[in-house]
Amino acid sequence: MKFSKIASDTYEKLQLGAGVFLTTFTPTTGTFEDSAIFGATDGGVSFSATPTFKDLADGIDNATLNLKELKRIDSWEVKMSGTLKTIDTTSAKSLLGAGTVNSNKVTANAELASGDFVDLWWVGDYGEKGGYIAIHLINALSTGGFKIQSANKDKGSFAFEYTAHSSVANADTVPFELYISESGT
């Protein structure tokens, strides 16, 4: 028997391309409006959902650590980061984390408002049958600040990092959702 094989459906389960960064997406139909595109990205996006664990046996003499019955999830850190190549006042306000827009002026605020937390989506192509992988960040807040990197004879870049948040009303809800659709709906 040879062990250097791959599953016969491997190429049907690949995520393809850079995907699109959105403000809204409808996973039941696999659709979005052009106006929902947050901005053009360069280099795709990076997503991580990392749990923090506690072990109830930790700190107890003679207790065995890493028993599955004593392991608990303390919290989740959910982040999405990347680089935008396009910007407008709406996305600039969002990148600030806390801000307001007045015509063409974007002002940073010293306090957070509930409207500073927004839902964001990343959606990428999946397989060869029109499928998608979608990641929904719930109550996302820009935690990477506002950054611009200009370049001689090139386009400017706006690095971003968003962190998803639970809320007091739903403290046990992990603030992201993952959808994998083979057919696009």
Kindly give the residue locations of the regions a language model identified.
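Solvent-exposed edge beta-strands and adjacent loop segments
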Residues: 1-92, 139-157
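Intrinsic-disorder/low-complexity regions
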Residues: 8, 54-60, 108, 115-118, ...
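Intrinsically disordered, low-complexity regions of eukaryotic proteins
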Residues: 44, 57-63, 121, 174, ...
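Generic structural motif
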Residues: 50-52, 85-89, 125-129, 140, ...
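Beta-strand secondary-structure signal
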Residues: 79-83, 119-123, 159-163
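Short helix-loop boundary/capping segments
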Residues: 89-137
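Mixed-charge, glycine-accented linear interaction segment located at domain edges/termini
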Residues: 132-185
